[in-house]
Amino acid sequence: MSAPVIPKTQKGVIFETSGGPLMYKDIPVPVPADDEILVNVKFSGVCHTDLHAWKGDWPLDTKLPLVGGHEGAGVVVAKGKNVDTFEIGDYAGIKWINKACYTCEFCQVAAEPNCPNATMSGYTHDGSFQQYATANAVQAAHIPKNCDLAEIAPILCAGITVYKALKTAAILAGQWVAVTGAGGGLGTLAVQYAKAMGYRVLAIDTGADKEKMCKDLGAEVFIDFAKTKDLVKDVQEATKGGPHAVINVSVSEFAVNQSIEYVRTLGTVVLVGLPAGAVCKSPIFQQVARSIQIKGSYVGNRADSQEAIEFFSRGLVKSPIIIIGLSELEKVYKLMEEGKIAGRYVLDTSK
């Protein structure tokens, strides 16, 4: 294969200050380091984390100026001299974890998302809201050629994240799992992964469009939190005692704390969504007496990533996506803040 022609400049969305103007403009194409690949990003999903990165409202500093995005799917067009795991023309994915140290106590047990020296795409390393982006070749995801690059983009964060959360819940096939925020980008994927893993799914969200989507994707029960008079009672009745696990992907502190009330005795509450400044509160007596576990789950490691991608490549999981141009990113953030997104927005970097 002849070497692709790589331009000196590209289109991207960049901001210079937290919460500052989102500028769609010409920016330089990065040069891959010795251990990196350069990916011609065709499509990028938009995650709630990207909104936080722009606002700068997490207790973790971003680099500035910053190109956000960490769900980038594209084609390898260049690679550093030490890279032997990718070839030019391969499909590759840019994930949240861009690079880890691979030597700390966490990396040694394959918990590289917890590496204190990790760099994050679209946060501390320029991400996928540009036409060309770099990623460490060890962390970059290998995407099978049978995959649609637009549809697989959300799998690279949302899919991996909810798949890992379901593994963290450690429940058995046939048991109940509740998903809060089930109609959003993470939630719609959580419903599908849970179904594919053999669980019975109860979806919690609001709105007729989200109810239809969740049920079409495999949810057995949908509870509209805005309509129910007693959500805790309704959830426990529908699952005959409460779900064995709850996957909290909503960005609601109230939803998190409410899930501790309705989860089944001996059940597990998994925290995934990160509402700014939120606190998880659990009555200690009830948590001890009912033997409830509360666990955090933070993206996934390389094995989790490839497993999540395999579910997609086998057709067991689909991405309910809406494709718009990269230049329209600010519109997506506005809809995200208003809670009006069903499924996932994906940006076409050519527009």
UniProtKB/Swiss-Prot annotation:
Pfam families: ADH_N (PF08240), ADH_zinc_N (PF00107). It is an enzyme of class 1 (oxidoreductase). PROSITE patterns: ADH_ZINC (PS00059). InterPro entries: ADH-like_C, ADH-like_N, ADH_Zn_CS, GroES-like_sf, NAD(P)-bd_dom_sf, PKS_ER. Zn(2+) 2 binds at C101, C104, C107, C115. Transmembrane segments: none annotated. This is Alcohol dehydrogenase 2.
